[in-house]
């Protein structure tokens, strides 16, 4: 059913790529154990109706699985990796991040095997549909999901965000300029890094 749906969207609706949220579950067997050579991944890789279609894997799943590096190595899928967390922590000044930042800029060769593979398989981004927007990332130190009835329990607690000295909106010109500079720095790192950049925008 998954394969047939992807082929339909590709051939009838013109979709040219798919991102699999919690993709590691696709590598589990009927008992929930990870195994090499997932039948579904093999079928998707070899289906002629999906030839040339971009496949992107999020390397974790809902029950704690983490398979970073496996989809790219086993079936040639692109992958989310640690780029976003690394850049966020490095830019806000966390200690001990320079080696990880270098690895991220090179395209995570430690994960993908080489800088050439990183150029092909590493999906680099600062923000996504999960968590804070780019503007909130430099405006808040903590999440404030207070208006939806969830009492701030929803959403990520480990955003690695930084408020530049003021929590939330401000008219302070120095704080606003610092926020703009940090956003530009993160965009610079995104664009010069080996891999496939996303289209993070300030909102």
Where are these regions (language model features)?
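Hydrophobic, small-residue-rich alpha-helical packing segments that form membrane-like cores
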Residues: 1-2, 41
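Active-site groove signature of glycoside hydrolases
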Residues: 3-29
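Conserved alpha/beta catalytic core and glycan-binding cleft of carbohydrate-active enzymes
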Residues: 30, 35-203
